[in-house]
Amino acid sequence: MYLFTGAAIAAAVIAPLAQGAIVNEAVPTWRDQANTVFSGWESFMSGFGGFNVADRSGSFCGCSLFNFGVGSELDADGDIRAGEAGLDVKLVGGQFSTQRLRAVVVNLATWDGCVETTQMKLRLVDGNGAVTFIAPTTLAENNQQTFDDGSIYRSRAYSFDVIDGYLSSGAVTQWRLEFTSPGGMALDAITIDLDFNVVPSPGAMALAVLGVTVARMRRR
């Protein structure tokens, strides 16, 4: 399913945008509740090969982001800019003692390209060691802006639902988010929310779309 939020697409923008901002971020109603995990990245330390620890306030410290796209590097804005081969991102979150994983929501802010649902997957390992890959259930285009220098900003949200139904044991011991991108795209910011409740949280997949206050200017 592909969704467009109201007034999400802007034709041309001259005003600067906050670096590391996710415009109209999709926030699950269960964020910060018991048995949920949140991690976010507003800046990156490594463009290729090294780990990037989640740096957004309130993040679970066990999550790290790696990019293995050949030719990628940190650009002048501190984003991970893909070379011709594109990005090859792995976001890992450690191991768990057979917990049920009900839902996952991912927000991406990118420049000059976007990640399609066919380029993203969630890798799950169950209590029996079986590995399963699943694709996003829905994709929402939450914001798109074209700037006077020709650069294009996009904010997208990807949702995975009823995840434990894909696993033979119904429980997750390991998870990893993986996605690739077209060449030249820059990853500006990312968040991930995971719901580990045995009973689905109220409004398990309800999302609140929040605006963003400009706090830091893009370094262009």
Regions found by a protein language model. Give the residues of each.
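C-terminal cell-surface anchoring/sorting signal
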Residues: M1-P16, G203-R220
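N-terminal targeting leaders for non-cytosolic proteins
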Residues: G20-G83
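Extended, low-complexity, turn-rich repeat/linker tracts enriched in Gly/Pro/Ser/Thr and Asp/Glu
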Residues: F96-R100, T110-T118
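Short, surface-exposed beta-strand/strand-loop-strand elements in extracellular ectodomains
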Residues: E116-G129
